[in-house]
């Protein structure tokens, strides 16, 4: 009994010593306080928010969005930026590809006047800028577009054709080790957009892999695989893409869920299209033949007409969205203000 008392006393003394050296809360018992709910930034697609299991992209974590070219990766990231800004947050976009279109970003709802943008010359510069912004505690979301464009300084300064094996992977590994802890303390969401490459000589399994080595796969709490699966047409004219996102990795909820939604050209993710799809799936909107109805009121014949009707009647769209979210138990409206001040800065 005395030995147990002495051990407890020694432990309390050790905890007090650790807190004096490293600050209060640096060591605690897991059961001392109730775990706070995960704060999120909505993605812009209610279907994807549901697939993520927590209602959006988690704050204070690393998110990787990858897929083939023109699949909607940057569009998805910009919608997250727009939602963070709409809630009063500050966003940064590190444009390593030097390809950000401000006009397109504005159409998606991004406040381009207040968006912090950097077009770095090297991978080291890009990641140092990201690290400084994250450690400031003032940024809600930072997007790095893309990992493939984070070219190490040695490669840029070297000759064309020089071998630089593993330089980018080492750079990413070092940077992620540094920023992971800072993200947790600042509550910043770091979104890394990544490209696909093919592994040579793979006969079994998928030959596809992402750039930048394996570090990002380990450090990311969420990994989203974005694919374009169909073209949306109005008559003979293509007006958008049908997109499928698979949650390949999820440390916050169950992984391997999928979401499908429409991305319309010069519009972005179709909120109304997602509401129609989810409403029909969960019995809130009735589909009879080509007609869509809600509580006896006709929304339109065909999905495009129903989409236009909801766009012209935002109050009705809000009502449908509220019912879907209440039924599924997920967070606030995708384009409504959300509280981004939960994490102390």
UniProtKB/Swiss-Prot annotation:
SMART domains: AAA
InterPro entries according to UniProt: AAA+_ATPase, DNA_recomb/repair_RecA, DNA_recomb/repair_RecA_CS, P-loop_NTPase, RecA-like_C, RecA-like_N, RecA_ATP-bd, RecA_C_sf
Domain of life according to the entry: Bacteria
GO annotation, biological process: DNA recombination; DNA repair; SOS response
Keywords: ATP-binding, Cytoplasm, DNA damage, DNA recombination, DNA repair, DNA-binding, Nucleotide-binding, SOS response
Chief place where the protein resides: cytoplasm
SUPFAM superfamilies per the UniProt record, alphabetical: P-loop containing nucleoside triphosphate hydrolases, RecA protein, C-terminal domain
Gene Ontology CC terms: cytosol
GO molecular function: ATP binding; ATP hydrolysis activity; ATP-dependent DNA damage sensor activity; damaged DNA binding; single-stranded DNA binding
Pfam family, one: RecA_C
Residues bound to ATP: 67-74
Cell location: Cytoplasm
Function per UniProt: Can catalyze the hydrolysis of ATP in the presence of single-stranded DNA, the ATP-dependent uptake of single-stranded DNA by duplex DNA, and the ATP-dependent hybridization of homologous single-stranded DNAs. It interacts with LexA causing its activation and leading to its autocatalytic cleavage.
HAMAP family hit by this protein: RecA
Family under the similarity heading: Belongs to the RecA family.
NCBIfam families: tigrfam_recA
Annotated protein name in UniProt: Protein RecA
Gene coding for it: recA
